[in-house]
Curated annotation (Swiss-Prot):
Pfam families: MinC_C, MinC_N. It comes from Shewanella baltica (strain OS155 / ATCC BAA-1091). Cell division inhibitor that blocks the formation of polar Z ring septums. Rapidly oscillates between the poles of the cell to destabilize FtsZ filaments that have formed before they mature into polar Z rings. Prevents FtsZ polymerization. InterPro entries: CAP/MinC_C, MinC, MinC_C_sf, MinC_N, Septum_form_inhib_MinC_C. One of its GO terms (biological process) is division septum assembly. Belongs to the MinC family. This is Probable septum site-determining protein MinC. Interacts with MinD and FtsZ.
Amino acid sequence: MSKPSLELKGASFTLSVLHINSSDLQAVMTELDSKLAQAPQFFLGAPLVVNLSAIQHDSLNLSALKDLLISRQLVIVGITGATTVLSKQAKDLGLAIVKAGKQSSTPPPAPRQTKIVKQNIRSGQQVYAKNGDLIIFGAVGNGAEVIADGSIHIYGALRGKAMAGAAGDTSAVIIAHSLEAELVSIAGQYWLAENLQQHSSDKSGCIRLDGESLMVESLPL
């Protein structure tokens, strides 16, 4: 029996959510450009859902916002939290209306395997631990990326980018002997360097999710 030419199947994906808190697009873009400059490759071509729940009026120029984001090579897949008027504008612009999903009561499965790297990760290098944790005995340099579907443990300085829970595992953590990262991310929630500096003083720490926000805890000496 021949296979059908198409199939419709359910699937879940981890998307970054851009929260717009002001209808002043010049101010929004100035702040966004500052964040993009800190981690340009991380956001390049990244699919985004735009959250408009903080905009309780209809004065936002959604068409202009879409054009400004596209000009920065960001891909808008839809909006969420919009007023009725803005939702209609979004549909006219070909954007999907995304409803927030319910939190699953079933905990994510434990990582099935661990990838161990016994060397420094240098600028331009990327290491990915699929379906498991990543343990690095060494430093992660500026411009390097380490990614894991599970947790990331770095027995050295983290100066590049670390993305744990890449497949959506919200229980994943990032542990490093020195937190100096350009970017850290767990299940799509991320901090740039400036956010990390507000919560850490370049010392050892454990970054985890607390609800939908990241937090950092000191490690016992």
